[in-house]
């Protein structure tokens, strides 16, 4: 009996050691269902573009920062819904502009800078909600390509410091 009790006691102790907390976490899931032929990839729906450190002297000489890609990835485009489209998808951008310049997105931080975005065809984006040209959409995944850069704001005075800007985009399928 003593051997059985000792064995049971040892088993209980050893199980207690194995049950120690070896890590845990929480997984949150979220998303949005939209009424559209395509979904928007998460990395496209909420983007941050970092321009790094830009030379004030270069911007003062009418230079621009290094151009960065700004892509909007459409995913799981449904063939049936795409077949109903006449033109494709148009993208419009909104944001705070500077000095009435609709193609210059204003920045915060009093640096005298503006953000410019160009569509793949080279046309500059307006931040007043005006939609650009329609892009045909195919079944599956599609990427709407833009480039963006920083420049001296029209009528602005450049100052050193950090800046930020926010633009929103909206898709309209036609």
Where are these regions (language model features)?
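Bacterial N-terminal signal peptides
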Residues: 6-14
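Mature extracellular/passenger domains of Gram-negative fimbrial/pilin and adhesin proteins
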Residues: 1-3, 17-174
């Amino acid at each position: 009996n003593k051997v059985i009790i000792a064995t049971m006691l040892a088993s209980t102790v050893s199980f207690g050691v194995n049950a120690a907390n070896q890590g845990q976490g929480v997984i949150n899931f979220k998303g949005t269902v939209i009424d559209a032929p395509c979904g928007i990839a998460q990395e496209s729906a909420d983007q941050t573009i970092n321009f790094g450190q830009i030379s004030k002297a270069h911007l003062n000489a009418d230079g621009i920062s290094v151009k960065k890609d700004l892509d909007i990835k459409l995913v799981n485009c449904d063939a049936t819904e795409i077949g109903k489209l006449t033109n494709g998808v148009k993208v419009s951008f909104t944001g705070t502009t500077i000095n009435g310049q609709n193609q210059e997105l204003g920045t915060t931080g009093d640096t005298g800078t503006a953000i410019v975005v160009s569509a793949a065809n080279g046309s500059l984006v307006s931040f007043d909600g005006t939609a650009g040209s329609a892009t045909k959409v195919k079944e599956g995944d599609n990427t709407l390509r833009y480039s963006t850069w920083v420049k001296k704001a029209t009528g602005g005075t450049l100052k050193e410091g950090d800046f930020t800007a926010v633009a929103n985009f909206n898709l309209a399928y036609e």
